[in-house]
Curated annotation (Swiss-Prot):
It comes from Salmonella typhimurium (strain LT2 / SGSC1412 / ATCC 700720). One of its GO terms (molecular function) is tRNA binding. Disulfide bonds join 102-199. It is an enzyme of class 2 (transferase). This is tRNA-specific 2-thiouridylase MnmA. Interacts with TusE. PANTHER family: MITOCHONDRIAL TRNA-SPECIFIC 2-THIOURIDYLASE 1, TRNA 5-METHYLAMINOMETHYL-2-THIOURIDYLATE -METHYLTRANSFERASE. The gene is mnmA. Belongs to the MnmA/TRMU family.
Length: 368
């Protein structure tokens, strides 16, 4: 008597990646079911329509593939474990990454537990562009095959046990191949554009959205030389290295180089700017990271040579990591790096393997 197929619950977002993931798993002989997660309670018509359209697309794909679609509401968990923390970070003048938090708290915690306990799943699957490899009994997280789409940066908080319970079918493919499969199958999501914007909250005017929850606190814009040259509407709307949306032109000395945010003085509510994207004040020689997560869940001690990304899609930066204590490390770059931003994540790699990462607590500025 042959063993019954393993049951996989695919997180169906209404997008092309999760749609094709479900089909690929069917081809591999798994018993596949879908789950649509509602993680945000919409409070205006436009948002409601987008969420309803995503659910309709997910349902249409499941109908086409002949699989059941479950739905679950994680809005309370999202608010408590992702959104409130996201607002706290912004209030403190830092720039958080909600997608990383959402993966940690919702997709690979609430969803994983619900799929296993309520739906009897052996595995969950998502449309993330990452791969897993099992080495010496431990699952490792690898970059996705498509370098342009690799999403390991967003999944560094996962431990080997979570990865062992997760499948990432499109991680072995390039995006154009995924779209081609969807087109060949006649899936409604084949030409749907990729979602951007805050995880689950969708595409909307970020400034308007943040303004609903955090009161704007206007303050001065000051140059690195101490000249006041404008007013900002709130430090939370600005991030290091930002060029657009400052509302300031050239200066009295006639230099037309664009202005960049090089620092935030949170205590005095001052935005500090300089001209030129390689201004020394924008450069860092390293960083201190905290809230560390290592995929192998082994504590890090000593020193390590590896590469780091301080933001998504950045080219890997060779670096040396030194352990400061159990939950803090110092990272020294081989070459200075622009716009290292507290609140964002530093994620470490050894070749194709994502080792883990942490939150940037402070940058180590280039002193000239």
């Amino acid at each position: 008597m042959s063993e019954s197929p393993k049951k996989v619950i695919v997180g169906m977002s209404g997008g092309v990646d999760s749609s094709v993931s479900a089909w690929l798993l069917q081809q591999q002989g798994y018993q596949v079911e879908g789950l649509f997660m509602k993680n945000w309670e919409e409070d205006d018509g436009e948002e409601y329509c987008t969420a309803a359209a995503d659910l309709a697309d997910a349902q249409a794909v499941c109908d086409k593939l002949g699989i059941e679609l479950h739905t679950v509401n994680f809005a309370a968990e999202y608010w408590d474990n992702v959104f409130e923390l996201f607002l706290e970070e912004y209030k403190a003048g830092r720039t958080p990454n909600p997608d990383i938090l959402c993966n940690k708290e919702i997709k690979f915690k609430a969803f994983l537990e619900f799929a296993a306990e309520d739906l009897g799943a052996d595995y969950i699957a998502t449309g993330h562009y990452v791969r897993r490899a099992d080495v010496n009994g431990k699952s490792r997280l690898l970059r996705g095959l498509d370098g342009n789409k690799d999403q390991s940066y967003f999944l560094y908080t996962l431990g080997h046990e979570q990865i062992a319970q997760s499948l990432f079918p499109v991680g072995e493919l390039e995006k154009p191949q995924v779209r081609k499969i969807a087109e060949d199958l006649g899936l409604v999501t084949a030409k749907k554009k990729d979602s951007t914007g805050i995880c689950f909250i969708g595409e909307r005017k970020f400034r308007d959205f943040l303004g609903r929850y955090l009161p704007a606190q206007p303050g001065k814009i000051i140059t690195v030389d101490g000249d006041e040259i404008g007013e900002h509407q709130g430090l939370m709307y600005h991030t290091l290295g930002q060029r657009k949306g400052l509302g300031i032109g050239g200066t009295k000395d006639g230099s037309e180089d664009p202005w960049y945010v090089v620092d935030k003085d949170v205590e005095n509510n001052v935005l500090i700017v300089a001209q030129g994207h390689e201004h020394p004040r924008l450069m860092s020689v390293g960083l201190i990271a905290q809230q560390l997560h290592w995929v192998d869940r082994e504590p890090f001690t000593g020193t390590l040579r590896c590469t780091v990304k301080t933001r998504y899609r950045q080219t890997d930066i060779p670096c040396t990591i030194n352990a400061l204590n159990d939950d803090r490390i110092e990272v020294i770059f081989d070459e200075p790096v622009a716009a290292v931003t507290p609140g964002q994540s530093a994620v470490f790699y050894s070749g194709e393997v994502c080792l883990g990462g942490g939150i940037i607590e402070q940058r180590l500025p280039l002193t000239v």
